[in-house]
């Protein structure tokens, strides 16, 4: 079943700080996109008002069900705006994450990145995600009491690789997200 997730919390270090309106889409067959636009961009952020945007196919993520509502996902993003824009001190390569379902219906993601290089100290992060109903136009919370959710929403994926761009478009129910990166 496809999924649409709204990020509620982002935390690096001891203090949470959510400055974006982040939505992530996952297709039925495991392709994914995460768009993270700033709510109030300022300064240099105005030229590219996204904290980050990335996408990948089901070939760029390894998923393992650990049982009891815990899943590990190891991502190696196919498209990554931090790489494309050559943003300093950002992670390159596989990101190992653990996802845990909460009784509230939210999903906690934890992991670590290596923004200063794989041989340097890691930086731990935590994100809290709220599933939303992709068949609705509004952001409608899914499964607040952790009951089984079913939807008639379908997913469509378009992957673009041509001489000018690499890109991925995912349609989840009534929602669409896309990332396109020009080739150099």
Curated annotation (Swiss-Prot):
Keywords: Cytoplasm, Nucleus, Phosphoprotein. The modification Phosphoserine is found at residue 143. InterPro entries: Hri1, Hri1_N, Hri1_N_sf. Disulfide bonds: none annotated. One of its GO terms (cellular component) is cytoplasm. Gene3D superfamilies: Protein HRI1, C-terminal domain, Protein HRI1, N-terminal domain. It comes from the Eukaryota. It is found in: Cytoplasm; Nucleus. The keyword Cytoplasm applies. CDD domains: HRI1_N_like. Belongs to the HRI1 family. Interacts with HRR25. May interact with SEC72. This is Protein HRI1. It comes from Saccharomyces cerevisiae (strain AWRI796).
């Amino acid at each position: 079943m496809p999924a649409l997730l709204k990020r509620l919390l982002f935390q690096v270090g001891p203090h949470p700080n959510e400055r974006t309106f982040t939505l992530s889409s996952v297709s039925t067959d495991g392709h994914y996109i995460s768009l993270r636009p700033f709510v109030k961009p300022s300064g240099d952020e105005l030229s590219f008002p996204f904290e980050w945007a990335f996408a990948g196919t089901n070939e760029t993520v390894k998923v393992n069900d650990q049982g009891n509502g815990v899943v590990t996902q190891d991502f190696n993003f196919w498209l990554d705006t931090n790489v494309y824009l050559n943003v300093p001190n950002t992670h390159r390569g596989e990101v190992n994450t653990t996802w845990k379902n909460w009784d509230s219906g939210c999903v906690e993601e934890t992991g670590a990145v290596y923004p200063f290089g794989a041989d340097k100290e890691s930086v731990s992060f935590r994100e809290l995600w709220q599933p939303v109903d992709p068949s609705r136009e509004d952001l409608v919370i899914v499964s607040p009491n952790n009951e089984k959710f079913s939807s008639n929403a379908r997913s469509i994926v378009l992957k673009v690789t041509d001489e000018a761009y690499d890109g991925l478009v995912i349609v989840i129910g009534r929602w669409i997200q896309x990332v396109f990166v020009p080739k150099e």
